[in-house]
């Protein structure tokens, strides 16, 4: 069995405020998560893991004006509940299979207004969850070097693409991906959140099957990604994640954690502790 003792909610553009300034509407999601956290605490005695915090959304393109949004997130929540911010910068250089990513600007992390907004995070001791795709990893490396005081969580292996013009090219893309994450790993302020490789955009095709993937299939196709990241970053800078509910298109929750346990089998007890708990506890301050 799996002993899930606590969870972190990561923004998903849900439950925004219906009124008020556009910039502050994402605070509604934080308010919603707080209400759910109270319910989860009530149910924790019955075996349901509590929500221990959240990663909220703020539009960093607001520049220094994003400070008002950050203050609103923090003021509506219990102290320490809001752990960080995710402003997705994922940009696909082709018409995507997933429509929500259309209309985004390329090179967002290089823009002065984005960087001005990003610079506000350290002031509030907030981390940054970086959701991007593999063609953007070098941009994130540059951002991490420019802001060493800000903790960055590298989400989902940097989104190795396997659809559109990248369909069927996983073997070709892997060495380039490895080269870029090797440089990123040299930034000590970057931590790796390992999971999210079973999304439709990764191109394994499990979402199109009648039966979801089993744990052995996941290990066979994903193990090299996991072992590469753990080798480069070290277990003390890596944490396993479920990326649910998005990964449920391809795999069940229990099966995914079974796969992660199989991947982690060669590591020591101390290293496993980092991968399954300690790194996440340190980074998200729980």
Where are these regions (language model features)?
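Mid-to-C-terminal alpha-helical segments outside catalytic/metal-binding sites
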Residues: 1, 5-6, 224-239, 246-286
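Active-site gating/metal-coordination segments in enzymes
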Residues: 20-136, 142-145, 158, 167-173, ...
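Short, solvent-exposed loop/turn segments at secondary-structure junctions
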Residues: 12-16, 59-62, 90-92, 135-136, ...
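Tryptophan-centric aromatic hotspots in well-structured domains and transmembrane helices
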Residues: 9, 32, 57, 128-131, ...
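Residue-level recognition of the N-termini of beta-strands and the immediately preceding loop/turn
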Residues: 5, 49-53, 82-83, 190, ...
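Active-site gating loops and adjacent loop-to-helix segments of metal-dependent hydrolytic enzymes
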Residues: 1-17, 23-26, 76-106, 150-151, ...
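Catalytic pocket-lining loop regions of alpha/beta-barrel enzymes
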Residues: 103-239, 250, 268
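Conserved, mostly hydrophobic/aromatic
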Residues: 7, 33, 54, 85, ...
